[in-house]
């Protein structure tokens, strides 16, 4: 069964690009962009990105070890791209690829949220409005 058939039966497939077997010809780039492209195909209203961090941070103060979480983004500006920084050490794209995924979602007037995925019950926590960054058109 292909992904579209599964969607027709209201089955949500979990798709993960295997970095060790993906070739240049069939590579999507990373799982963040793959998720956004699939969300676009299925005209999803919302893409939930589970991450190792709570969302996009505006700044980090080395002296206080504190950072400022951006709670809402309605437009992807140069400042937002700058906040994303460079690719992460653990993954391929880090926050930069999540911003690119948000660009895809915003281009189709859909929403995206980044929230911490390694906490217990991340979707329930998101429903309770925990720390996260929402991307939506204003």
Model-derived features: positions:
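C-terminal catalytic "cap/lid" subdomain
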Residues: 4-138
């Amino acid at each position: 069964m292909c992904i579209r058939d599964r969607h027709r039966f209201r089955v949500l497939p979990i798709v993960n690009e295997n970095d060790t077997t993906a070739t240049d010809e069939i590579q999507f780039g990373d799982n963040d962009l793959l998720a956004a492209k699939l969300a676009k195909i299925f005209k999803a209203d919302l893409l939930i990105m589970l991450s190792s961090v709570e969302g996009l941070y505006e700044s980090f103060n080395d002296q206080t070890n504190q950072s400022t979480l951006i709670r809402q983004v309605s437009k992807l500006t140069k400042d937002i791209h700058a906040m994303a920084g460079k690719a992460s050490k653990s993954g391929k794209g880090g926050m930069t690829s999540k911003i690119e995924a948000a660009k895809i979602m915003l281009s189709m007037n859909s929403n995206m949220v980044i929230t911490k995925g390694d906490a217990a019950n991340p979707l329930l926590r998101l429903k309770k409005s925990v720390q996260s960054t929402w991307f939506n058109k204003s």
